Amino acid sequence: MDKFIAAVVAEEEHKHQIEESYEASGEVDDAGRDDMDDGDDYNSRNLIGEGLKEPIQIRFVDKFDTIEEGIDGGGVTKEFLTSITNEAFSASNGLEALFIENDQHLLYPNPAALEERKATLQQALIKEHSQTWNESTRDLLRRYEFLGRIIGKCLYEGILVDIHFAPFFLLKWALTGGSGSGTKESGYRANLNDLRDLDEGLYQGLLQLKNYSGNVEDFSLNFAVTDTIRTSPTTTNQITRELRPGGSDMPVTNENRLVYISFMARYRLQQQPYHQTNAFLRGLGMIISTSWLSMFNQSELQTLVGGSSTEISVEDLRSNTQYGGLYTIGDDGMEHPSVSLFWKVMQSLDDADRKKVLKFVTSTPRAPLLGFGNLNPRFSIRDSGSDQTRLPSTSTCVNLLKLPVYRDEKVLRERLLYSVNAGAGFNLS
């Protein structure tokens, strides 16, 4: 599968190069580190569409409005994209979380996001379908579209992000533009099994209803569903939707319970999140061809997004590492003693800490799909002085670990893990 994926990506890039025969200067964006998810900053980036296929140059601006030093050799762009995804796909973003997670911490579009936005507007006495109302709801959907483009950009550039999507949501990607679906529309059809990835409690309840041997009218169900919609951190509204016309007056019986289960699955998985999902898929399709997405199943798409879930191979990483400065390997082919200590420490770490080290250096915790030989630029190590109290540092733009000339394995391990767990940002110093 890996070689096939690589071939498809190469073909997509070649196709784009042919289509874009003119010379592009590339998009330049100044990004505030502390305002990655700020409304105005977010909206300005919503204007970026097909242009995201072009190289973009990012300059980080600190809280003093000072542009950070450093040339974007790919690493700054990579940090920019991963920072956006870390913020925007967080399930703890308060009242208007765009994505929420299930019990397995897998993400999918917040089904209630649009209803919550409308309820908030109603509470503010904004007239329905007024210019303010329409612009506010469109703004929400533009955010979903923007995130679709960001994920598409990550896929297009081969940038892995530490995000895990729910399988039913990934299946919608795979079926976008497929047989029986319209342009930019998913051919996905809801089923009871997919509900398990959305709401385990609802899935179990409907399963019990399906297999109930008594009279299901004892549950007093009808063909309607009531949701609690947040209008502020402390207030909520109750909204009832009929699953079919006249559903509020239609009881669920032994005879129609399978129809009820089907309608409930369709409402929760398709109808309620319809606009949010389609906006995301529209943005994704601006960067990645829908025919390309349809080649992969859910598991393969997740691998493309987040990388291989297998353990980090120290041997593979070591054999594909470049060295500089004092650590340059000479004609004798021997590693510097400090480098040998580093690899000894890496071998002793568990997989979780190995991934932390990898993220510290490359900004992503997973290996490329085809192994570290396909990491671009290569993982590299160079010396950074002989002070034993100095901590390792990195330049993520070139996947470079700056490793002091440590002489003791214990010291190296302690200093490395301290740096890794400190959560340092991009820094060229």
Where on the chain are the PLM-derived regions?
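Hydrophobic, conserved cores of late-appearing folded domains
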Residues: 1-170, 174-194
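C-terminal catalytic/scaffold cores in eukaryotic proteins
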Residues: 36, 169-429
